[in-house]
Regions:
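Metallo-beta-lactamase
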Residues: 3-17, 77-126, 209-232, 237-240
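Active-site neighborhood of phospho(di)ester-bond hydrolases with catalytic His/Asp-centered motifs
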Residues: 41-45, 63-79, 105, 130-133, ...
């Protein structure tokens, strides 16, 4: 397993070609299990020290080799709650094993919360992801260019437009020319409480362009691979919108 480094150069295309398992823990937290069994967790959550509770319970007992926080807000920064004595990545840096590469690219939080936020690139099983955390839509073009084209983007959207408008969320996601958009950071029964003031995503889904295919997954876990991802439309004449994949619930950790 590699040591963590602070490099943030251009991100190369994903390693391997066998696919990678991704589990949606809830809110903005996802777990990748690479072909070499390396486990990478992004944005474990916790309730705030004061104010209304956001979550229906404590963060579940997830074991990981690397725990990543995109930024230092309570609902993204509970890396100390992760089991397995993971390596921690809480700012720009890199992590790599034979089966997975993770690169955190420095950017900025959306809205009134002007603070650092990392765009976290995960490459495994021949698939390239970017987890946007709570990133702004009016991003630094150089930061986004360093990430490059991805297969899957995780973006924060909900019907309350808590972080940014639906159009702004779409603009952020499309900057990476993804094949699939995965929504996150919304009201999810059993995980996120209504007292968070977040809402669901049904109105957001209804607002999407007419050619967007919405795929609702059966549960919180799926395998992403070249065989299951939609084909990339390479020419302007045949270009189509990406698909939107919505993870199901409720989570069971194995």
């Amino acid at each position: 397993m590699s040591a963590l480094s602070s490099g943030t150069g251009n991100v190369e295309q994903g390693i391997g070609a066998s696919g990678v398992s991704v589990t949606y823990i809830g809110h903005a937290s996802f777990l990748w299990t690479a072909p070499d069994d390396t486990r990478v967790l992004i944005d474990p959550y916790q309730d705030p020290d004061d104010g209304p509770e956001w979550f229906d319970g404590p963060f579940p007992p997830v074991v990981a080799d690397l725990a990543v926080s995109t930024h230092d807000h309570f609902d993204h920064n509970a890396v100390d709650k992760v089991s397995g004595s993971p390596v921690l990545l809480t700012g720009p840096g890199e992590f790599e094993t034979p089966g997975i590469r993770v690169t955190a690219v420095p950017e900025v939080h959306a809205g009134k919360w002007v603070m650092p936020n990392s765009l976290v690139v995960v490459e495994a099983g021949g698939v390239k992801f970017v987890h946007c955390g709570d990133n702004r839509f009016d991003f630094d073009p150089e930061a986004v260019a360093s990430v490059g084209q991805v297969d899957v983007v995780m973006v924060a959207v909900d019907d309350s437009q808590h972080l940014m408008s639906w159009d702004e969320g779409w603009q952020l996601a499309m900057a990476f020319s993804p094949r699939v958009i995965v929504p996150m950071h919304y009201l999810l029964p059993g995980v996120v409480k209504a007292s968070s003031t977040l809402l669901g995503i049904e109105k957001w889904l209804a607002s999407l362009p007419d050619d967007v295919v919405v795929r609702r997954l059966d549960g919180p876990k799926t395998t992403f691979s070249g065989d299951v991802l939609p084909p990339r439309q390479e020419t302007p004449d045949t270009r189509q919108s990406p698909q939107v994949w919505v993870f199901g619930s409720v989570l069971t950790i194995d």
